[in-house]
Amino acid sequence: MTNVAVVYHSGYGHTQAIAEAVAAGAEGVGGARVSLIPVGEAEVREAELDDADAIIFGSPTYMGGVSADFAKFKDWTSRKWLARAWHDKLAAGFTVSASWGGDKQNTIYQLLTLAQQLGMVWVGLGLAPGNNHSKGSSDDLNRTGASVGVMAQANADQGNEGIGASEFRTAQALGKRVAEAALRWQSVPLAQAA
């Protein structure tokens, strides 16, 4: 059994919808148990984060970076940094912005940097870029062409119907990949690996 936590902030519901898709992808892996944790609940659900073998971080991209609520959570994790409590856990990340570009890469790098500060091991998306040739379309998996994590696009003037179906499939693929990696990561105890 492996425990995967998806911890996220969502301002308008788009990031929550992607978080739920990430969680669904992880839940589809036999032997994976998933916790979906809004950042506002992180402190009261701290044990679930500490027990997780992998933590997937998610934030909307606001003004080229993580949201203020996610930044507050990020600062809260300094206690984990000090204790090295999340050292060697797997990590991954996702973000959503209204624009196709939206400087989402900066947000993903903030999530990656957080994981590295905490001594975690980052799992990238692992998908080829979609929608980057004449026969491609916005229905392609990984339509934004990300590699470090999911960088989804959602129309600002719509609810979850403004998120393309391929974004949900891409998010599910990330959840699946992280859960599978966590199972492999656990499969050989360190004493045997040495």
Q: What is the role of each PLM region?
A:
Residues 1-86, 135, 148, 157-194:
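N-terminal beta1-alpha1-beta2 submodule of the flavodoxin-like/Rossmannoid cofactor-binding fold
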Residues 8, 53-55, 59, 97, ...:
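Short, flexible coil/turn micro-motifs enriched in small/turn-prone residues
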Residues 12-14, 59, 65-66, 93, ...:
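Gly/Ser/Thr-rich helix-start
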Residues 90-142:
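Short, glycine-/small-residue-rich phosphate/pyrophosphate-handling segment
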Residues 94-96, 154-160:
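Short, local alpha-helical segments
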Residues 137-154:
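Short glycine/proline-rich, acidic loop/turn segments that cap or connect secondary-structure elements
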